[in-house]
Amino acid sequence: MRSSKIQNSMMNVTDRAVRESNVKLIEAPSIALVVRSSILQHTFPVAQIDVDATFNQDMKALVVDSDRFEHRYIYYALSANGQEILRQTSKQGGSVNSLVVPRLMDFEIPVPALDEQQRIADLLDRFDALVNDISSGLPSEIAARRAQYEHYRDRLLSFPEKKA
């Protein structure tokens, strides 16, 4: 995945192919997760899917129940926890880096009330737009805004740990 938002594709699958094969159509909005790739050695790629899509075996889709969860919040929370997800779910051995999917599905992120999820996602969307709009500007300004974005993203997604 080269982008944090999937809004179109270079390749398309016909309705007939979906009907007559094992291809599964993932409805938007959802979240794409890379589960097998050499990039998993250092990065956990996650993207928001804004169009209906299909994937190969190297990716999984997380279909979000919009009555309970804001998909943008889930995307940001997974992105912010990427290194911890890799630490807890990476498969040892093998010729290509991969994640143990059941462990990935068991990974917990803090989930506040839906209106709070939406508020956090709206704030992070604004920071994200600011960083991307500035990308044609001065490199030092870009670096400062990215650092600010990461700081606020991590602060917004920090919650007290639950007592056992």
Predicted feature descriptions by range:
Residues M1-A164:
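Charged, alpha-helix-forming regions
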